């Protein structure tokens, strides 16, 4: 496919599961466009502050070979920003996880006739939530890597 693939998420504590998801997106399209939750959006969505700022997370994502562009949004979902950008971006597909089958973003993409591909969760990699729990459980001064 000549067109880019759109993904979205928080990407806080970027880990192997995130990287696998980005790589998968790159395999089905020409470049990856990321809609990234802002710090305020994460606070609304998860009732906690992100570990890294949206600017830091965007810089990490932009450094990924497959990522073409990163757009930061303040709402709980990127639909308002996508509404403004989807025509100019002309994505060929939206990739999301099977956890978001009925999401407002999926419905929006379908309304724009953009195919939606569902990826299974990379369960062999820890989630950001489990990584944060592991870090919080460490005795003070202990290295999280072991």
Q: Which residues does each PLM region occupy?
A:
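Nucleotidyltransferase catalytic core that binds NTPs
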Residues: 1-146
């Amino acid at each position: 496919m000549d067109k880019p693939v759109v993904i979205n998420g928080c990407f806080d504590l970027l880990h192997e599961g995130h990287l696998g998801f980005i790589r998968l997106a790159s395999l089905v399209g020409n470049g990856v466009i990321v809609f990234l939750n802002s710090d305020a959006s994460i606070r609304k969505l998860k009732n906690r502050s992100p570990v890294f700022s949206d600017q830091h997370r965007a810089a990490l994502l932009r450094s990924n070979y497959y990522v073409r562009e990163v757009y930061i949004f303040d709402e709980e979902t990127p639909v308002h920003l996508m509404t403004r950008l989807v025509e100019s971006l002309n994505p060929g597909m939206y990739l999301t996880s099977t956890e978001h089958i009925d999401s407002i973003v999926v419905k929006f993409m379908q309304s724009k006739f953009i195919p939606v591909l569902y990826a299974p969760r990379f369960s062999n990699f820890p989630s950001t939530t489990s990584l944060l729990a592991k870090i919080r459980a460490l005795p003070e001064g202990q290295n999280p890597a072991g």
